[in-house]
Amino acid sequence: MNSTSTVRQPGGPRQQRRHTPKANLSDLYQRAFKEAWVKLNPKIMVKNPVMFMVWVGTLITGMLTLNPNLFGVTGTSAMFNGLVTVILLFTVLFANFAEAVAEGRGKAQADALRSTQTQTYAQRILADGSLEMVSSTHLRKGDRIVVSVGDIIPADGEVLEGVASVDESAITGESAPVLKEPGSDVASSVTGGTRIISDELIIRVTADPGKGFIDRMIDLVEGAERSKTPNEIALTVLLAVLTLVFLIVVATLPPPANYIDSPVSITLLIALLVALIPTTIGGLLSAIGIAGMDRVAQFNVVATSGRAVEACGDINTLVLDKTGTITLGNRLAETFLPVNGHSLKEVAAIALAASIFDTTPEGKSIVRLAEKMGATLDFDRQQAEGVEFSARTRMSGTDLPDGSEVRKGAVDAIRGFVRSRGGKSPTGLDEAYGKVSHLGGTPLAVCRNDEIYGVIYLKDIIKPGIQERFNQLRRMGVRTVMLTGDNRITASVIAKEAGVDDFIAEATPEDKIQVIQQEQAAGKLVAMTGDGTNDAPALAQANVGLAMNSGTQAAKEAANMVDLDSDPTKLIDLVTIGKQLLITRGALTTFSLANDIAKYFAIIPAMFAGIGIGALNIMDLKSPQSAVLSALIYNALIIPALIPLALRGVKFRPLSADQLLQRNILVYGLGGIIVPFVAIKLIDLGISLL
């Protein structure tokens, strides 16, 4: 159907914002409980070698419950076998429940993202300029559409015309509207599912239905199978080897036990095996990995894989853009500094002419400052032509109708431009350049043809608290490198004030890749942020690439993490989360292995009670049966008891690796020995009262 364009003006009925729904804990636990039973499928259980052995043991003791003499006379009753079976079954279920809860939280995030997607109608612009109302499912990449106040943007796209405020709270959770306009990579990118709350935009669709940003995020979050990280695989292999070794040890016990006339029942052998193998970390390992991705999601960051989250914890070098990460964002024109005898008004007029086609926030601030000083254009803008900034020339400007060329840019670039036209560097330029640089600002020179008129002072403000965050990273052994297009003096001042370890001035996009490659060649893992198309190669090269949701499609596709809030500083938080993931896994592994000591002292004396090794019963457990049941009950209950810690993570402290290791051994090693001794004794006392 064809129609004419009708533009709804601001001031109409206020649209109610949708908020990302939170997962209902009751529903989450109910689904996790059901999923725990589903995961008893042997095809699923075999993926976790530790819990698979417990599962097999459950089947065997279950058969012995039905027929205690199935494998010959064992000396254990059906009642005892049944109790062991129930305890082992719950051990497996608790491990499955931990994984299901972690997975459920990820699925809740996918549901929240999916809730932002609604089938809407869009006004598609046809070749003759007329409008056609179509369903959002019929839009294709390259289509041009019109969206007005109150409309939900039907697909990912790029703003071609117009300026409007967009409510992105459905995706980012941030209530403040975001200004969208053509020009810069960041401001011109829009995401399907967000809402126009003022004015009108003409957008070019950049993704087919089902292939937009939100669709990709949903696919990543609820992928059919979470791929394990290298460290997780290594730990799984270690646990599998330990399980095999202990299985061989247990399997070789019956002959010597029979020889000393102290036969051991199959049920007791299974109990010993379960006590020997590291069931605690085996039951929580998957949950820890999934929870790491979930903690990242709670920061409104979507990771493409657990590998990316884990890599954050191993990062040695952070490569950070100055603007937006270390400083508050867009530099703003503060004042003009005339040189070569020119007046302030003359500099303002040339700066206005050089910036009139510049749609960046910096360019607009120069225009505002010049107009505030009374500057006006002395040419017809329609007959002039804008010259865009490029990383190669490091300047931009305007070609005037009379053939004159006005330019603004890096001081050395403008010097070269003027000299190429027969001019020379004027007196006072170096002084103005140095003055701005020593203030930590960015100096831009402005010229007309072969004459430099003055310097523009662009002011940068360091983000509050950023120095302390860099100090924390330094204590963790992470090196920070600031990249900036500023000159060396300005870069040095800002680097010193911010507290970064190193900086690269007058950097180009190629420099980012070189820095990353140099660090990686030295065996370092590198993380960086980016939002523009020119950042995409470096984001792909980095071990951790964090793209901004407000950035270009190319940047988001190259990165392995996307920040829905578009906050570059969040990369520092991700390093902390990654280290917390590794520390949590290490702490619970230490605790699990230390637990085994108490379980040995409970079960081994019970197995060989007839040969007089009562001295090993240091916990004074009441009976062999009570000792076995107490150890197995503790073994089962410790898994759900540690689920909150596995999901939340061990509290992170910015310490060195040696300090973290010492603390890990003291808290989780010593604690892993003491806690089970106390708990098993208390359980034994409880059983004796029954």
Swiss-Prot record:
Assembly and partners are described as: The system is composed of three essential subunits: KdpA, KdpB and KdpC.
Question: So what EC number does this one have?
Answer: 7.2.2.6
| Keywords (A to Z) from UniProt | ATP-binding, Cell inner membrane, Cell membrane, Ion transport, Magnesium, Membrane, Metal-binding, Nucleotide-binding, Phosphoprotein, Potassium, Potassium transport, Translocase, Transmembrane, Transmembrane helix, Transport
Primary residence: membrane
| Function text | Part of the high-affinity ATP-driven potassium transport (or Kdp) system, which catalyzes the hydrolysis of ATP coupled with the electrogenic transport of potassium into the cytoplasm. This subunit is responsible for energy coupling to the transport system and for the release of the potassium ions to the cytoplasm.
Residues covered by region (Disordered): 1-23
- Molecular function per GO: ATP binding; ATP hydrolysis activity; magnesium ion binding; P-type potassium transmembrane transporter activity
Q: Which HAMAP family match?
A: KdpB
User: Where along this sequence does the record place binding of Mg(2+)?
Assistant: 531, 535
For membrane topology, the record states: Multi-pass membrane protein
Q: Which residues bind ATP?
A: 358, 362, 389-396, 408
Family, per entry: Belongs to the cation transport ATPase (P-type) (TC 3.A.3) family. Type IA subfamily.
Per UniProt, the enzyme's principal EC class comes to translocase
| Catalytic residues identified in the record | 321
Family matches, as CDD domains: P-type_ATPase_K
Q: Which GO terms describe its cellular component?
A: plasma membrane; potassium ion-transporting ATPase complex; potassium:proton antiporter complex
Q: What organism is this sequence from?
A: Synechocystis sp. (strain ATCC 27184 / PCC 6803 / Kazusa)
Q: Which biological process terms from the Gene Ontology are attached to this UniProt entry?
A: potassium ion transmembrane transport
Gene3D superfamilies per UniProt = Calcium-transporting ATPase, cytoplasmic domain N, Calcium-transporting ATPase, cytoplasmic transduction domain A, HAD superfamily/HAD-like
How is this protein named in the record?
Answer: Potassium-transporting ATPase ATP-binding subunit
Q: Where in the cell is it found?
A: Cell inner membrane
User: What catalytic activity is recorded?
Assistant: K(+)(out) + ATP + H2O = K(+)(in) + ADP + phosphate + H(+)
